[in-house]
Regions:
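N-terminal Sec-pathway targeting helices
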Residues: 317-328
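Conserved catalytic motifs of the protein kinase core domain
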Residues: 40, 85-86, 187-189, 208
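A conserved long alpha-helix in the C-terminal portion of kinase-like catalytic domains
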Residues: 220, 231-307
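Active-site Asp-x-Gly
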Residues: 189-192, 197-256
Length: 341
């Protein structure tokens, strides 16, 4: 925990809350969550660490937009990102159980109906259009002009980590992933819920979809990436299988390869945090256990790349930047010469 119940309670009191109770919810690794009860109404308080406080405004804004467009998410109430206090979003509590906890209690017919609702809700999120690609950044922007360039940049960062750790197997997996990116078609600019997890889907007592929760990892790019994140974690789940079938991805070899790519992409990204403490100091799962499916298919992407090919890759990445630098330098030189003459 990076917050305290007493500290949050004191802040809420200064902000006008009265006659309330707080209860800590021991779930998640990126945020601290509390149940807030006041005037017979129940809320969730989702608290963010200081270095991610900028997310409160962004996630709050997206939640408002989702609610307006009929997407099943928690209804936001208020947010705060004060520099001298706890940054949080307060939204109305969503009653129900997570789909992960509910899974074993559901019949095949119930799962089929729930998956219809889940797919529809996910597709509605993907209908939100953006202007660029990548992870959500401060001010709600996405920073890449190319989806491929975003993927390759993330893979390069992971490769550097594995190289530093002298983990040659995962270095070669990164090399294979990098090469596979060239086969991916540029998707349209659309929002991607990249926290697609059975833990982040709430099901009501009457076995209906109540809400998706957790939107701090929003991306802009290929919606299949979000589905693959579910696969990477829950590869053997009957719910995952049902969702893939409804998306038409289950029996399509090319699409399955793309799903595997995105699953392993998630693996190599999260692996770079494996030796770091979690923001709320909760235990971090062993990545091969947490992303079990991804760990079983990652070696399908292994490829040894020699130094010459590495140099070619570097040049392709830097070509545009070098061209801009050269043109800028020439224009500056011409301006100086012109001034001297």
């Amino acid at each position: 925990m990076f917050t305290t119940k007493e500290g949050l309670a004191n802040q809420l009191k200064t902000e006008g809350w009265k006659d309330f109770t707080l209860e800590y919810v021991p779930k998640g690794v990126m945020t601290d969550t509390y149940i807030l009860k006041s005037n017979q109404t129940t809320y969730a308080v989702r608290c963010y660490p200081i270095f991610r406080s900028w997310l409160t405004k962004i996630e709050y804004g997206y939640l408002q937009a989702f609610v307006r467009n009929g997407i099943k998410v928690p209804v936001p109430f208020v947010y705060s990102n004060k520099k001298d206090g706890v940054s949080y979003i307060i939204y109305y509590w969503v009653e129900g159980e997570t789909l992960k906890d509910k899974n074993d209690k559901l019949s095949e017919e119930q799962i089929n109906s729930i998956c219809d609702e889940v797919v529809e809700n996910y597709r509605k999120i993907s209908e939100f259009k953006t202007t660029k690609y990548g992870r959500v950044a401060e001010e709600g922007l996405f920073n890449y002009d190319s989806w491929k360039r975003f993927l390759q940049s993330e893979i390069e960062q992971s490769r550097l980590f594995f190289k530093h750790e002298k983990d040659e197997e995962n270095v070669e997996i990164c090399d294979g992933l990098y090469e596979y990116v060239e086969q991916i078609e540029e998707p349209s600019h659309c929002l991607v819920w990249s926290d697609f997890s059975l833990d982040n889907i709430i099901i009501s007592d009457d076995n209906k979809l109540a809400a998706f929760i957790d939107f701090e990892g929003l991306m802009s790019g290929d919606p299949i990436l979000g589905v693959s994140y579910l696969l990477s974690q829950e590869g053997n789940s009957r719910i995952t299988r049902c969702i893939l079938q409804k998306y038409g991805l289950y029996d399509n070899p090319e699409q399955r390869k793309l799903l595997d790519f995105y699953s392993v992409f998630r693996y190599i990204r999260l692996a770079t945090y494996s030796k770091l403490p979690t923001p709320n100091n909760s235990p971090r799962d062993i990545i091969d256990n947490f992303l079990h499916y991804a760990s079983t298919v990652k070696c399908d992407f292994k490829k040894h790349i020699d130094c010459v090919e590495r140099m070619k890759r570097w040049f392709r990445i830097m070509k545009k930047k070098l061209t801009i630098l050269i043109i800028t330098a020439l224009l500056s030189l011409m301006a100086i010469v012109g001034a001297c003459c």
